[in-house]
Design a protein with these regions (language model features):
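Conserved SAM-binding loop of SAM-dependent methyltransferases across substrates and taxa
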Residues: 1-5
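Short beta-strand element of Class I
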Residues: 6-11
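Conserved SAM/SAH-binding beta-strand->alpha-helix loop
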Residues: 14-15
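S-adenosyl-L-methionine
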Residues: 22-61
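A short SAM/SAH-binding and catalytic strip from SAM-dependent methyltransferases
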Residues: 47, 59-81
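Conserved class I S-adenosyl-L-methionine
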Residues: 73-76, 101-120
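A short glycine-rich, Lys/Arg-flanked "PGG" loop and its adjoining helix->strand segment in the class I
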Residues: 78-99
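Class I S-adenosyl-L-methionine
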Residues: 111-198
Length: 198
């Protein structure tokens, strides 16, 4: 409610999280004596975001705070909110020069995300492995952030900026790489078989 010039959309797949967010939003706007006219919240799977937000919506900034790290195994990584396939999906509605603010307590997720962002067409403009050491003025501490900090876990954060142009994306889906390898092997086998018949 401090920035009435901005519109906000809060998305989570968990209704419990959204109910708490709704209560906090209502309390903040009531305390400010303002109607809730620039905030919406919704429950959806972020992997289906392209059905919710379109390029015409022109999003300037995305905040990804303490998302599920999906660390069980390599195959679960594809569900990460910072996995390249997802970061590329955000590019469709994030305007050129738009930013993603990302915070996490998870070391593995952060380390991998530092690689995901550049491969997905983003420049990492700011990064820290201890957000509270020199806490920036823009940081708004979340409940999860407070909980992890009390446990002695350092909060990692970065700001990434979308590069213009599709050619800035260098990531290739592993399924595509596997298919290309199969096709190349089949073509080579066919060529060798053809040479044997001559």
């Amino acid at each position: 409610c401090a920035h009435p010039e901005n519109n906000y959309l809060g998305i989570d797949i968990t209704d419990k999280v959204l109910i708490l967010a709704k209560r906090k939003i209502e309390a903040a706007y009531q305390a400010a004596g303002r109607p809730i006219d620039n905030v919406k919240i919704m429950s959806t799977d972020i992997e289906r975001i392209k059905g919710v937000i379109t390029p015409e919506d022109e999003v300037s900034r995305i905040y990804i705070n303490f998302c599920n790290p999906w660390s069980k195994n390599d195959s679960s990584h594809k569900h990460r909110l910072t996995y390249p396939r997802q970061l590329i999906a955000y590019r469709e509605f994030l305007k050129d020069g738009g930013e993603i603010y990302f915070k996490t307590d998870d070391d593995d997720l952060f380390r991998d995300s530092v690689e995901y962002f550049p491969a997905s067409g983003y420049d990492i403009e700011w990064i820290t492995y201890d957000l509270h050491e020199n806490e920036p003025a823009w940081n708004i501490r979340t409940e999860h952030e407070g909980m992890f900090t009390e446990m002695g876990i350092k909060i990692k954060a970065l700001i990434a900026r979308k590069k213009p142009g599709a050619d800035s994306v260098t990531w290739v889906d592993p399924k595509v790489l596997k298919r290309m390898a199969r096709e190349a092997a089949a073509a080579e086998a066919a060529a060798q078989e053809g040479e044997g018949n001559v």
